[in-house]
């Protein structure tokens, strides 16, 4: 049997936090409500591991929700940050580090000719929506069910991430007028997109999507889907936007657009490009980006945008990722992990379906296949909650939601992967 976990100190801290912050957390999914438990309070992280305040160590497959692709607290990133810290934390003025990271992003990402740094993925998506409308002169936008583009009002329509996990159709406080111009379609359904364009001639500014959905579990694009979106947007004078906050520099150095060979007009980024510090960015064709203030009339600004610490961590992280063999290693360890999970479940007659690409993976507790959000919802969330609790007791930290992708890192070793597969085998055996 799996031993119980001592989380007394975590429980005390979370109990106090609930009187200080809504739900006791700074972001909803951290509260563990989706897995019917109380959260683990972390004390420190290093490499592929996280330690809680009770001294328990976990092999971490959340990775701070994506940024920690090189592993937590990578010594080269920490050293670079310490050097920059001596010069100050924020200038509120241009710094050469912005140029350096911008050049790296432009060199790597096929669609990006110019880039603007912000402080979060939500900010990037808010700005890119405004830019889509400013450039085209059209108000409507198409998004996909289960795709999450941050918590801005206009995107909280059939969204993924915490909204999917908690079963909330939308968020209270979002006026209908705000989302009236947000059209939705099922992911991987090109015909539905074509119908929306036919029903709204010359009114749609563009299509935004996670090219690989990581906020409704892990859903990959069907062959021809991304290519079809590129074609239909061009035919209708609309923009194609890839939200690569999660996939950027993770499923390949040039992101999903490099991996799948489809170049959008605009791209949003975050997570990895900040190396664990708050960051976001949006970029694209120079013709479009020239609309952004102060070059053009579309206003967007930020006090801490392009701050030297985030730029430093991003530069060093991308330097590490450019090293030979990086993505081959990530692909191999992630495939081994997922194959091990799927095999262990099937040996215990537990229905499961999963996929992986490079350093991202996900599984659903159903027969599959899962091609869209509606099919994802057939996953057994109660069973996932049980698996999550048991894996914590085995020293493995999975995302506390059945609808979030998992992340591997360069710091995960063969021993870590083997230990994780062994833990899955043991808990699946206990369940069967």
UniProtKB/Swiss-Prot annotation:
GO biological process: chlorophyll biosynthetic process; protoporphyrinogen IX biosynthetic process
UniProt similarity note: Belongs to the class-III pyridoxal-phosphate-dependent aminotransferase family. HemL subfamily.
Transmembrane region(s): none
InterPro entries: 4pyrrol_synth_GluAld_NH2Trfase (IPR004639), Aminotrans_3 (IPR005814), Aminotrans_3_PPA_site (IPR049704), PyrdxlP-dep_Trfase (IPR015424), PyrdxlP-dep_Trfase_major (IPR015421), PyrdxlP-dep_Trfase_small (IPR015422)
Pathways per UniProt: Porphyrin-containing compound metabolism; protoporphyrin-IX biosynthesis; 5-aminolevulinate from L-glutamyl-tRNA(Glu): step 2/2; Porphyrin-containing compound metabolism; chlorophyll biosynthesis
Keyword line: Chlorophyll biosynthesis, Cytoplasm, Isomerase, Porphyrin biosynthesis, Pyridoxal phosphate
Reaction it catalyzes: (S)-4-amino-5-oxopentanoate = 5-aminolevulinate
Stored Gene3D superfamilies: Aspartate Aminotransferase, domain 1, Type I PLP-dependent aspartate aminotransferase-like (Major domain)
Record's signal peptide: none
Originating species: Prochlorococcus marinus (strain NATL2A)
Gene name of this polypeptide: hemL
Name under which the protein is recorded: Glutamate-1-semialdehyde 2,1-aminomutase
CDD domains xref list: OAT_like
Main location: cytoplasm
Molecular-function annotations in GO: glutamate-1-semialdehyde 2,1-aminomutase activity; pyridoxal phosphate binding; transaminase activity
Protein localization: Cytoplasm
Domain of life: Bacteria
Assembly behavior: Homodimer.
EC number from the UniProt entry: 5.4.3.8
Pfam families associated with the record: Aminotran_3
The keyword Aminoacyl-tRNA synthetase is assigned to this record: no
Cofactors demanded by this protein: pyridoxal 5'-phosphate
Modified residues (N6-(pyridoxal phosphate)lysine): 271
One annotated Gene Ontology cellular component of this protein: cytoplasm
